[in-house]
Amino acid sequence: MAQKAPGVITCKAAVVWELGGPVVLEEIRVDPPKASEVRIKMLCASLCHTDVLCTKGFPIPLFPRIPGHEGVGVIESVGKDAKGLKPGDIVMPLYLGECGQCLNCKTGKTNLCHVYPPSFSGLMNDGTSRMSIARTGESIYHFASCSTWTEYAVADCNYVLKINPKISYPHASFLSCGFTTGFGATWRETQVSKGSSVAVFGIGTVGLGVIKGAQLQGASKIIGVDVNQYKAAKGKVFGMTDFINPKDHPDKSVSELVKELTHGLGVDHCFECTGVPSLLNEALEASKIGIGTVVPIGAGGEASVAINSLILFSGRTLKFTAFGGVRTQSDLPVIIDKCLNKEIQLDELLTHEIHLDNIQEAFEILKKPDCVKILIKF
């Protein structure tokens, strides 16, 4: 049980002490929220592949730090300037915000707000941390403006979304990054149209989000590509029409296999969800000449990727994305509503559950072929 001291909460959190080190449970102190901040009691969290990269120093090697950027919680306390939020509200901590007033927000064309962009400094807006090791007082870096693998977290209110409390908390956690990123890429970033063709490289949580988004947008052919045969069944549940396991065709490239299913033309939209650098060129080659669009979504931890410019000269478009282009205040509630009315069903995402006390086990579970999403309980 977390113990409260005046103004400070002592609780448990998962901490990474060094580059490539294990995630260990520590007792930490969580300061009260400052002016525009809220302190959140986490109800559940989940594991995203980016959290694995976090332990390896992505995007900046800051240690010690608390990983986790997916989760849902209830506000415990608020700063004096945290408008629109109050104790008891169910919220998602997020890694980007939406002011609604900056040039980017007013265009309606992007979710990358000038005022509340993604931040990976590991610190709050005033340049300090709200978390420290209880036994030593050493400051702990935040991750992606949130750090959700802790019983209590502090976030700026502009990076928090108050959500409908009727939604399943595990589902809300899955929507706070992975699934929404894939879904949004088809809806907000590329506007997949009715009758179009789509290829999805990597059928994890992000890839399944792409598949469901493409289905709801009316795509007629949705090709899933994965070396894990288990993902074929998962993809079908979310709307995939065709499945390719490259291991079954060692003499052919992925792009060749995709073209075989599209009369030699390739697809209108290809979404690269693995983060494997070499697959980006394959994704480009798998898209149609002149009109094909490729969206890299997977985070692979590579600082740079070599792209065959000759493929781009053939009129294909390469479009990068953050959070699938989904605006946190304007669009994310729409996706939540789709879940509440069963237009989107996320039960099939949840394959494993662990308690925060056993957080290191999650990294081994993630390697299992039947693992899609791991729920972290507190």
From Swiss-Prot:
UniProt-listed InterPro entries: ADH-like_C (IPR013149), ADH-like_N (IPR013154), ADH_Zn_CS (IPR002328), GroES-like_sf (IPR011032), NAD(P)-bd_dom_sf (IPR036291), PKS_ER (IPR020843)
GO molecular function: S-(hydroxymethyl)glutathione dehydrogenase [NAD(P)+] activity; zinc ion binding
Signal peptide (residue range): none
GN (gene name): ADH1
Binding site for Zn(2+) 1: C48, H69, C177
SUPFAM superfamilies for this protein: GroES-like, NAD(P)-binding Rossmann-fold domains
Source organism (scientific name): Artemisia annua
Localization terms from the record: Nucleus; Cytoplasm, Cytosol
Gene Ontology BP annotations: formaldehyde catabolic process
Listed name of the protein: Alcohol dehydrogenase 1
Keyword Lipid metabolism: no
Entry binding sites for NAD(+): 49-53, 202-207, 226, 231, 274-276, 297-299, 321-323
Subunit record text: Homodimer.
Disulphide bridges, residue numbers: none
PROSITE patterns hit by this protein: ADH_ZINC
Main location: nucleus
Pathway connected to this protein: Sesquiterpene biosynthesis
Catalytic activity field: (+)-artemisinic alcohol + NAD(+) = (+)-artemisinic aldehyde + NADH + H(+)
Cofactor: Zn(2+)
Protein role: Involved in the biosynthesis of the antimalarial endoperoxide artemisinin. Catalyzes the conversion of artemisinic alcohol into artemisinic aldehyde.
Record Pfam families: ADH_N, ADH_zinc_N
